[in-house]
Amino acid sequence: MYKIGMFSKHGKVTIKTLHHYDEVGLLRPAYIDQETGYRYYTSEQLSQLHEIVALRQIGFSISEILKIIAGSNVDEILKQRKTELESEYQNITNKLFRLN
């Protein structure tokens, strides 16, 4: 098990981010010591965190990631995000064309 500080370093996120993910139900600690309040995470959760970070980098919102993790309409959510990215790409390409 990892304490939150070590887990945040391995996951390359801030402790504040982990607290937020806990608050919104995205990634809860595996164990919280009742005496100290220390939060502990497992190595399996590190994989989950990497997945969450990757989805955030692609531009998914926390609510979308919650839906993906829950398994609801995953294909539809991914398809919609792909369409959004393609549209953004086209807009940027058009702007670059105008600059030339």
Spell out what each predicted region is.
Residues 53, 58, 66-100:
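Short, charged amphipathic alpha-helical surface segments
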Residues 1-62:
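Basic helix-turn-helix/winged-helix DNA-binding cores
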